[in-house]
């Protein structure tokens, strides 16, 4: 199956073609010969949902087969359907219906991402890491990837910006201790130490996003005020001394001119000093 086909549809479930092409190859595979998808973007599974699915499977069986690929003789990797696999595993069933497909790593990674995006089950961090993985595997731009997964380029860029945060903050998003908007606001802080410290404040005070943003403005505002206080007195002192010196020189030049001497007076300001040039002609 060409890789481009996995990204070529937006309205129809991209998994449909796999099922249609492999429907004649449904097999009952031993559970102990199947292992999870190495490219599975989801790292946190809702156990309550798996238990609910297991109860349904206990009554009705596995209605939709999982999709796998054969990695070595009689050993299979899940391409799609890991929740079903986990539910069946919890029921201690020995076999599960599966469709065997011959797909490469890039196709498997793409399918895993698409399946989870369609169900909106990924956390923002999982989604961001999945995008990064696909970009690393494929020679494509964010814009091309956005078109292929039905997202805007800015949406993908914003998700991937979350990966600039410290691992501690990313983990907090992953376990839903803070929201994506909380995490995004932390990007305004300059250092990881500030971000981690504010994460602790958010958790301790149970701040919402608005309160978090207000606290960030306090932090940034205090830093700016401290910088201003440190430099302002020095600038004022220098300005006063320079002004006195400049006025004294100008008064002297004016006095000389008033006495009938023709001279040129120029001044130039650089980053480090004022330069004054006085030219007095040798001949009148």
UniProtKB/Swiss-Prot annotation:
GO CC list: chromosome; cytoplasm; nucleoid
Coiled-coil intervals, chain numbering: none
Chief place of localization: cytoplasm
Pfam entry (one): HTH_ParB
Membrane keyword on record: no
Annotated InterPro entries: Chromosome_partition/occlusion (IPR050336), HTH_ParB/Spo0J (IPR041468), Nucleoid_occlusion_protein (IPR023705), ParB/RepB/Spo0J (IPR004437), ParB/Sulfiredoxin_dom (IPR003115), ParB/Sulfiredoxin_sf (IPR036086)
Binding region for DNA: 143-162
Domain of life assignment: Bacteria
Keywords: Cell cycle, Cell division, Cytoplasm, DNA-binding, Septation
Described purpose of this protein according to its UniProt entry: Effects nucleoid occlusion by binding relatively nonspecifically to DNA and preventing the assembly of the division machinery in the vicinity of the nucleoid, especially under conditions that disturb the cell cycle. It helps to coordinate cell division and chromosome segregation by preventing the formation of the Z ring through the nucleoid, which would cause chromosome breakage.
Alphabetized NCBIfam families for the sequence: nucleoid_noc, parB_part
Family to which this protein belongs: Belongs to the ParB family.
Protein name: Nucleoid occlusion protein
Organism: Listeria monocytogenes serovar 1/2a (strain ATCC BAA-679 / EGD-e)
Higher taxonomy: Bacteria, Bacillati, Bacillota, Bacilli, Bacillales
